[in-house]
Amino acid sequence: MGVLLTTGPTSPSRAASDASPPSPWVVRWSRLVAPGGTVLDVACGGGRHLGWFHARGHRVTGVDRSAEALRALAPLARAGAEIVKADLEDGPWPFAARTFDAVVVTNYLWRPLFPTIVAALAPGGVLICETFAAGNETVGRPARADFLLRPGELLTVCDDLHVVAYENGFLEAPARFVQRVAALRPKAEDASGIATGPPRHLLQTLSSDAVSAPMPRTGAR
């Protein structure tokens, strides 16, 4: 995490979030997380999402195997964030029997962990996941198939969840192929045994200006 220069006091969550901005996908679907709910950031790195959720009143937990990355999160830890050092690929899951209102995974892929991540969602909890996808080998790293999602793979991972949004495509600046999903674990039936009805998760729509804007011209006549 880079050095943050300020002219006044800075909160721990502000320092973490200012070092690197959160993913727009995470920001967009964070509204599915219950107010004040618990958030687990898997392979949290420098804590860009931990800081962002912490600043908005969520109880946050971050896990990563990099001691260097976690040392940078000391201010967040002092402010109440739970920071865990663990090797998720060569060790036990450190949150056995615990569930979270949201699990965030970005730019990280370890396929054997997917069932555990899904199981860590509390009823009504949301999985917000975004990482590199097949095609990225044509523009940069990662390029190995082990680190790239196959077409539709996240939909298979979320087979038992309610998928609210899914995208698989190309982004610019920097050029990369990504796949991403926002999916909810269904809530249990209420005490009377009657289901609460289908959830109503508002989707974003284009503004009228965007719809009416002329298409850019490509090539010469």
Which residues make up each language-model segment?
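Conserved SAM/SAH-binding beta-strand->alpha-helix loop
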Residues: 66-68
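A short acidic, Gly/Pro-enriched loop at the edge of an enzyme's catalytic core
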Residues: 93-102
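Conserved beta-strand signature within the Rossmann-like core of class I S-adenosyl-L-methionine
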Residues: 125-132
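Core SAM-dependent methyltransferase catalytic element
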Residues: 171-221
